[in-house]
UniProtKB/Swiss-Prot annotation:
This is Crustacean hyperglycemic hormones 5. GO terms for molecular function: neuropeptide hormone activity. Keywords: Amidation, Carbohydrate metabolism, Cleavage on pair of basic residues, Disulfide bond, Glucose metabolism, Hormone, Neuropeptide, Secreted, Signal. Disulfide bonds join C55-C91, C71-C87, C74-C100. Residues 1-26 form the signal peptide. The gene is CHH5. It comes from Penaeus monodon (Giant tiger prawn).
Length: 122
């Protein structure tokens, strides 16, 4: 066999191995829930990015987003890191959330926000 023929066969074998490995790797990612696999598939890391695991009630992105924005606004007013985290603790069922609610939201909307906390909470 000539040197050129051997080289071309080695290149062909290498290509087959690379293609086989890449398709096997891609198939293994299809069922994977790792963050890397999610990024490769072009999906977000989590459908429930704002989800607090302490919230055992109904998962409603809109309600959770509204409650979370209240905590963000409260943090922006007071600029203390503990405000943002404590406001969200126990699925918004805490005294910091109530204080933020009283400070930022008109009184006629308090019951609505408290109902949202009950819906997403325990």
């Amino acid at each position: 066999m000539s040197l050129g023929l051997i080289a071309s066969r080695l290149v062909a074998v290498a290509l087959v191995v690379v293609v086989a490995c890449s398709t096997t790797w891609a198939r293994s990612l299809e069922g994977s829930s790792s963050p890397v696999a999610s990024l490769i598939r072009g999906r977000s890391l989590s459908k429930r990015a704002n989800f607090d695991p302490s919230c055992a009630g109904v998962y409603d992105r809109e309600l959770l987003g509204g409650l979370s924005r209240l905590c963000d606004d409260c943090y922006n007013v007071f600029r203390e890191p503990k405000v943002a985290t404590e406001c969200r603790s126990n699925c918004f069922y805490n005294s910091v959330f109530v204080q933020c609610l009283e400070y930022l939201i008109p009184a006629d909307l308090h019951e609505e926000y408290q109902a949202h906390v009950q819906t997403v909470g325990k």
